[in-house]
Amino acid sequence: MAFQLTPLRVALVAGEPSGDLLGASLLGGLHARLPASSRYYGIGGPRMSAVEFDAHWPMEKLAVRGYVEALKHIPEILRIRGELKRQLLAEPPDAFVGIDAPDFNFGLEQALRGAGIPTIHFVCPSIWAWRGGRIKKIVKAVDHMLCLFPFEPELLEKAGVAATFVGHPLADEIPLEPDTHGARIALGLPGGGPVIAVLPGSRRSEIELIGPTFFDAMELMQQREPGVRFVVPAATPALRALLQPLVDAHPSLSVTLTEGRAQVAMTAADAILVKSGTVTLEAALLKKPMVISYKVPWLTGQIMRRQGYLPYVGLPNILAGRFVVPELLQHFATPDALADATLTQLRDDANRRALADIFTDMHLALRQNTAQRAAEAVAHVIDSRKPR
């Protein structure tokens, strides 16, 4: 790093919990790689704030899911983006890192890049999964892309965007062999007997849409597999309060409702019923059979269906390039279908062994010391812009 008279300043924006995780990992690497006097600020969540990050706005302001659902929040989101843009243009940082949240970050990155501020984007949008458009935005907005998956840099470099594969921090964090017995002890679950983890989402809207269906499926599973126990982790106290009435409405269920501890809950499980998202990758890294599902409002679903061209939405299937675990989406996500598919995943030992091999290969491919690799790439971009 060239000699620096004033502290380096790196602005970062994360818009949802998965971005907060990535941001915290990156910040850990930056603290080790850049001068100790460097400052980090912008928009982030609690994990980023815990590693010396100054959050000018809380991440929750941007955490809105779905096309239709976002409409009512657009004025405030645009106001925040406009104010942040004015601040960053008035006092330019040495680099800007947008962490996922492409709808928010790309417009901001394009404006900053136009003003000569180096722009880095962490998490390549799914240009390989969705039709058209976004690659053009990336070319205009991004100086360097940090990619979680190994096949992404080649796609970007063909379009003229510099990119680095950095792996996924979850692959660094999660052990290659999960301690199922230890996780059951931590949750107060019996060591024997089947356990299914059920994760209906990390947002109120997700739980309201699919939570009742998941609990009805749990009721059917317990009827068909009487010894089964369920563990349902709630991401926050507010979401636990939202889930509690569903637990109360199914008094015969053997269910443990936890606050946080999603990874422990999945580690304790023999099979997982999970709403699509980053958590499906976490389940794969834990080597667990699973069923992936989601429900979104009808119009949002229609828009997503028309934009997508991959036949799958779950990260385990995307990374494998084929269906290795079942997906039941929208109107296919009925209690009966979910119960049947999840119990099949629970009972099929040959499938369990095959998935363990597939998921171990994924784990090894993604285990790249992400914090160090990502921080090194950011430092290289900053250093390449500094006068010698």
Curated annotation (Swiss-Prot):
Reactions catalysed, as given in the entry: a lipid X + a UDP-2-N,3-O-bis[(3R)-3-hydroxyacyl]-alpha-D-glucosamine = a lipid A disaccharide + UDP + H(+)
GO biological process, one term: lipid A biosynthetic process
Domain of life: Bacteria
Enzyme class: transferase
Pfam families named in the record: LpxB
InterPro entries in UniProt: Glyco_trans_19
Keyword ATP-binding in record: no
Annotated GO CC locations: membrane
Pathway the protein takes part in: Bacterial outer membrane biogenesis; LPS lipid A biosynthesis
Keyword annotations: Glycosyltransferase, Lipid A biosynthesis, Lipid biosynthesis, Lipid metabolism, Transferase
EC number: 2.4.1.182
Family, per entry: Belongs to the LpxB family.
Function as written in the Swiss-Prot or TrEMBL entry: Condensation of UDP-2,3-diacylglucosamine and 2,3-diacylglucosamine-1-phosphate to form lipid A disaccharide, a precursor of lipid A, a phosphorylated glycolipid that anchors the lipopolysaccharide to the outer membrane of the cell.
PANTHER family xref list: LIPID-A-DISACCHARIDE SYNTHASE, LIPID-A-DISACCHARIDE SYNTHASE, MITOCHONDRIAL-RELATED
Protein name per its UniProtKB record: Lipid-A-disaccharide synthase
This protein's encoding gene: lpxB
